[in-house]
Amino acid sequence: MTPQAAPAFLETDRLVLRPATAADAPDLLALDNDPAVMRYINGGRPTSAEDIRDRTLPRLLHDHACTGTRGYWIAREKDTGAFLGWFELRPLADHDAAVVELGYRLNRAAWGRGYATEGARALVDKGFTDLGVQRVTANTMAVNTGSRRVMEKAGLTFLRAYTEDWPEAIEGSEHGEVEYELTREAWQRGR
């Protein structure tokens, strides 16, 4: 099955989100080897094909019994089929869908075009309407203003700032991390 032919999990006006397959490895490798994309993840260091095969793909291919689906989806542009990156709506506890983490990693061609917000909003809605989610959480480095804006546009609100002890500090980590959240009740009020 080609990456474009995998069944869709969710469609928006401009996006198709579908489960990852092993055929996505080259696109994932290119995504994770862009220093700008990885700036707030690992400081922009390159990723090996072995890391994609042994770490990234198993994470993206994992099914969560509590939601009946995966926690990560490949994002493609609906009109062209172009690879944009991936989105995450993953249960924090594998046996319980109540609390999920929202995440996204898009290539630079997708930046500033509203794709991250569009995909995040659609996944949040899907989580609350179909997957039994009670709370969506998202985290990023405090200095990652682009990601923070996406969280806010997707309806999440600032919850807290905190610090982590990372094995390898990257530029900006000295400012700490932030957590955002959206509860089912707040989501329902905002509809």
Residue map of PLM features:
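Acyl-donor (CoA/ACP) binding surface of acyl/acetyltransferases
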Residues: 1-40, 76-191
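Conserved GNAT-fold acetyl-CoA-binding loop/helix
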Residues: 36-60, 70-71
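Catalytic Tyr-X3-Lys helix of short-chain dehydrogenase/reductase
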Residues: 60-61, 128
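Helix C-cap/alpha-to-beta connector motif
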Residues: 62-66
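Short, high-confidence coil segments that cap the C-terminus of an alpha-helix
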Residues: 68-70, 133
